[in-house]
């Protein structure tokens, strides 16, 4: 039995990289895919847009919905979720993949970059999960998946990239909290 057939999936940061790979794998198993990412114009160093990703995913014969979305902004996330529900009818799976990375040490990292990582990684994950909640509650087998590391409090993981590690662990904290909080709705959070 294919557990992903006819599931409606949202993937943040799905225009390239890991997000696109996950989207293609799910699409190959029959899932409809909504891509929420802010890249609608190709970048010279980072190829791929929501539109090129959608074209790759459509080859699997599933519904695909590319939506330009900056997950730092409530109104954009709310609008995107409304579009997904209008187009697909429901949401079964949310994959929080969008992430900002800056591998500077604390002394060198501008606070603007610190804020960006936390706004996207932690706040964006929280916002997308919270906004999808009413729709996930209606699904028969709802899931939220955050692409974040397991907790490892050994100082070596923080030593060189404290701010980035904090931002990614913020995503992991969402898993811990929401898995317990959403348990009453039978929403699996990993």
Regions found by a protein language model. Give the residues of each.
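Substrate-binding pocket helix/loop in short-chain dehydrogenase/reductase
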Residues: 105-116
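The beta1-alpha1 cofactor-binding region of Rossmann-like NAD(H)/NADP(H)-dependent oxidoreductases
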Residues: 48, 68-80, 111
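Conserved glycine-rich Rossmann-like NAD(P)H-binding loop of the short-chain dehydrogenase/reductase
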Residues: 29-52
């Amino acid at each position: 039995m294919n557990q992903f057939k006819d599931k409606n999936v949202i993937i943040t940061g799905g225009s390239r990289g890991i997000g696109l790979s996950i989207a293609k794998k799910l699409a190959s198993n029959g899932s409809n895919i909504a891509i929420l990412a802010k890249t609608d114009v190709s970048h010279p160093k980072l190829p791929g847009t929501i539109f090129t990703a959608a074209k790759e995913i459509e080859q699997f014969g599933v519904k695909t919905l590319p939506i330009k979305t900056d997950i730092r902004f409530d109104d954009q996330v709310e609008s995107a979720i409304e579009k997904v529900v209008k187009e697909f009818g429901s949401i079964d799976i949310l994959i929080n993949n969008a992430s900002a990375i800056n591998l500077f040490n604390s002394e060198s990292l501008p606070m603007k970059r610190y804020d960006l990582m936390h706004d996207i990684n932690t706040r964006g994950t929280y916002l997308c999960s919270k906004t999808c909640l009413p729709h996930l509650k209606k699904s028969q087998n709802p899931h939220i998946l955050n692409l974040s590391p397991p907790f490892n409090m050994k100082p070596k993981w923080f030593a060189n990239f404290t701010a980035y590690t904090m931002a990614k662990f913020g995503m992991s904290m969402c898993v811990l909290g929401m898995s317990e909080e959403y348990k009453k709705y039978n929403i699996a959070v990993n």
